[in-house]
Amino acid sequence: YSDIDLMIISESIEKDAADIQKVITNLWDGGIEASHTVRELPDIQKYLSTDLHAFTQFFETRFISGDADLYNRWDNALHNSIDDNSKKILITNFVEDVRQRHEKYGDSPKMLEPNVKMSAGGLRDFQSIEWMMMISNKPLLNSQHELTQAEIFINHLKKNNLTTAAECKRLLESYKLVLSIRHLLHTTTKSKTDRFEFSGQTKLAAMFGYEETDLMSFMKNYFAAANIIFRVSHSIIKKFKVEFVNPVPDSFSYDLDEDFYIKNKVIFLK
């Protein structure tokens, strides 16, 4: 019940309007519910300065069909739009967006009836740090590797020693568990609900093979997964705050030993 996100890139929406309408009509006639947007190259700068959530739709794109040259020009324009100033603005906005979301949906990964997408430790926490990492490391944008974006992101964390290999493994397993729960919530309720209510917990526990009397063990596993996502996202957001939101000069850092130093209450690996 989650939409297929489809972005159509056009040199001129006015000129290509009939072809665009034909594509969308064919999808609907084929029973494919696509949430589509149509963009032109100037939209990159437009949404960069006006709409954070619309701009993030430009991340994680995969070329499917059409004019490869136009897609490459779009990709290059997206990369070039993210300079040091826009990095600071975007990451600052993402940090504030996380704060507001937690305020609205819950700032604890151990809520009794969490929103598996929006509450602390939910999928959007994972996606938010993924997007922030993309902004700070532009080669991650729009990777065409035959891996999920989550796997590409976690491989980047491991490769750059941003966390341990064991923690990366736990993070990916946690993400997959919460994602599976969301998929089953949509399937069992036949709706786009993300609220993990008590009735849904009982039903999904049985689908995961738990006995009726063992709901607590199932939810314990969910809370453990949500806590891992929350802990890693909190740690990475602290790092981004130091680097982009409230940067502190290197002269204010202090060496702890030959491997680690501390700056603005955050410990870094040399």
Q: Which residues does each predicted region cover?
A:
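A nucleotide- and high-energy phosphate-metabolite-utilizing enzyme signature
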Residues: 1-270
